[in-house]
Amino acid sequence: MGSACASSFFQFLSITLLLVTLLSMLSTTLASGFSIKEATVQDLQLAFQRKQLTSRKLVEFYLNQIKIQNPVLKGVLEVNPDALAQADRADQERRTKAAGSLSRLHGIPILVKDNIATKDKLNTTAGSFALLGSVVPRDAGVVIKLRKAGAIILGKATLSEWSHYRSIGAPSGWSARGGQGKVCNLLLLLT
């Protein structure tokens, strides 16, 4: 496997793990008995098909959870101001396209680490103020694939500043932009 392929694979894997972690933090069950907390991507797609859920409602739910939990967890560095518009577009496509013609990630909100380039209104800073406001020339390869699959880029997840490419004595999970993040698994066990 080439280093570019390996890098893209590991970026995609970390994005998937972020989605799973975010889903595991949620504890809301919709009136129909559908639990977002325990939902897989397949469950979410089934809820979309059964009209139990829309991408807009899912994005609104995640944005609310980020608003509630992020001041403590500090896991999300920035949310995409266009996420709701992307969700509306996904809902419209779901209404007009043939069932089964959309990808499994269509309409699913996903966070990407802040060192993965997105050519949109989000910053790509690797957690550093030094890159705040810089403009990337294009989406990273993994983001191109996610967008093509219909995923909604919900925002940027924090990471150790410069993706931990600095002093080995620096604490993990710290960045100038994001502050010190918390270990989510431990917090979940304590709640």
Question: Which residues does each predicted region cover?
Answer:
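Immediate post-signal peptide segment of exported/extracytoplasmic ligand-binding proteins
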Residues: 90-109
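Secondary-structure junction/capping motif
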Residues: 54-55, 101-103, 140
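An N-terminal boundary/leader segment
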Residues: 2-89
